[in-house]
Amino acid sequence: MASVSFQDRGRKRVPLSLYAPLRVTNDKPLSKVLANNAVPTNKGNKDQQIGYWNEQIRWRMRRGERIEQPSNWHFYYLGTGPHGDLRYRTRTEGVFWVAKEGAKTEPTNLGVRKASEKPIIPKFSQQLPSVVEIVEPNTPPASRANSRSRSRGNGNNRSRSPSNNRGNNQSRGNSQNRGNNQGRGASQNRGGNNNNNNKSRNQSNNRNQSNDRGGVTSRDDLVAAVKDALKSLGIGENPDRHKQQQKPKQEKSDNSGKNTPKKNKSRATSKERDLKDIPEWRRIPKGENSVAACFGPRGGFKNFGDAEFVEKGVDASGYAQIASLAPNVAALLFGGNVAVRELADSYEITYNYKMTVPKSDPNVELLVSQVDAFKTGNAKLQRKKEKKNKRETTLQQHEEAIYDDVGAPSDVTHANLEWDTAVDGGDTAVEIINEIFDTGN
């Protein structure tokens, strides 16, 4: 016996998700803004907290042009929905896989939603990002079906009523005919038929007249509406008049920019703190705040930086390359030794960290050249062959005394960095001792 089979046309009805969809308010895809464990917690046990978000591409036609709209993302549990036959994390366009820790990668059999059911608002174990919103569900289509059934019911009642009236009239007419003689009944029937025919003709004429009037009115309204639409688009108008109408608008917009008060650049957005109010280990030497102003003069254990570095601080050329070899906070805390000594009203904290840098590193020579650079710089200046009198020599000795480790104000906290540039094998061993202490005692 022959059988009939139909091939798949390529369009299928997508199963409905149990939950209301998500929508991203910016241009990023959902996988870039949503965590990979964002599974709704409304249904299923801990083994079934696994599934995928399926993209529904949206657009709108405006004046014959397709305008893209933000996509809706619908959630389906693993083994359900339009991609129910895919294994977990199978790379598929428009699919974002999510799962909670401990979930099994097996079909959940939690099913999908019926068309008459309302979508569930999804709940999550963590707060959604600010750029992700839940699309509120619309009224289910069941209400429209109910309204159609009611309208059909009313139509059936209306169609039934004429038949009932006809039955009643016929029975009443039969009883009257039986009560009167046959001749008189026949004449009455003929007269009634003539009256009915006249009434039906009058009604049909009235309908035709009203239709003619309505057709003219609707045609005029349509022509007027088309004319208004063309005028709004600038079609059929005098182009010079259209330009004159646009000129005042442009002048208005240009003048509005002139009257807008401009920002006063001299106003400071935030009040800058004085250097003395900032702890020494948080100061950044730049601009007017030189290295000497932030950390004191070079000398003793403060032995890093030449004249340019001391003057410009972090703005000096080569600082970024050297800073790449300085340890970060985590390295100081977890990779070195931290010693704490209690003082009268403070703590003295010493950080001791050692690191090995290959000689092949292009920045290590630049760092080594800055160690004790202020001493080397003074020596180079002394090579100049110039005659100096005794008075200038005495002044120079006094100036060099600035670099000695003299006493600092008692309320200043110091940071000590020592660089041991001893060569060990093929690498340069750099030892960093970072001491923060109070000299008040």
UniProtKB/Swiss-Prot annotation:
Stretch list, region RNA-binding: 16-146
| Molecular-function annotations in GO | RNA binding
Basic and acidic residues compositional bias, start-end: 238-255, 269-278
Which CDD domains does the record associate with it?
CoV_N-CTD, CoV_N-NTD
- CoV N NTD domain residues are 14-136
**Residue numbers spanned by region Disordered:** 131-219, 231-278
Query: What modifications does the entry list under PTM / processing?
Result: ADP-ribosylated. The ADP-ribosylation is retained in the virion during infection. Phosphorylated on serine and threonine residues.
Q: Which residues carry this modification: Phosphoserine?
A: 5, 143
Amino acid composition bias (Low complexity), ranges on this chain:
143-215
**Which keywords accompany this UniProt record?**
ADP-ribosylation, Host Golgi apparatus, Phosphoprotein, Ribonucleoprotein, RNA-binding, Transcription, Transcription regulation, Viral nucleoprotein, Virion
Which subcellular locations apply to this protein?
Virion; Host endoplasmic reticulum-Golgi intermediate compartment; Host Golgi apparatus
What ranges does the record give for the region Dimerization, renumbered to this chain?
277-379
Q: Which residues form the CoV N CTD domain?
A: 266-382
Cellular component GO terms, alphabetically? host cell endoplasmic reticulum-Golgi intermediate compartment; host cell Golgi apparatus; ribonucleoprotein complex; viral nucleocapsid
- Pfam families found in the cross-reference section: CoV_nucleocap
Quaternary structure and interacting proteins, as annotated: Homooligomer. Both monomeric and oligomeric forms interact with RNA. Interacts with protein M. Interacts with NSP3; this interaction serves to tether the genome to the newly translated replicase-transcriptase complex at a very early stage of infection. Interacts with host RSAD2; this interaction inhibits viral replication.
General function of this protein: Packages the positive strand viral genome RNA into a helical ribonucleocapsid (RNP) and plays a fundamental role during virion assembly through its interactions with the viral genome and membrane protein M. Plays an important role in enhancing the efficiency of subgenomic viral RNA transcription as well as viral replication.
- Similarity remark: Belongs to the alphacoronavirus nucleocapsid protein family.
Q: What is this protein called?
A: Nucleoprotein
Q: Which organism is it from?
A: Porcine epidemic diarrhea virus (strain CV777)
Q: Which gene encodes it?
A: N
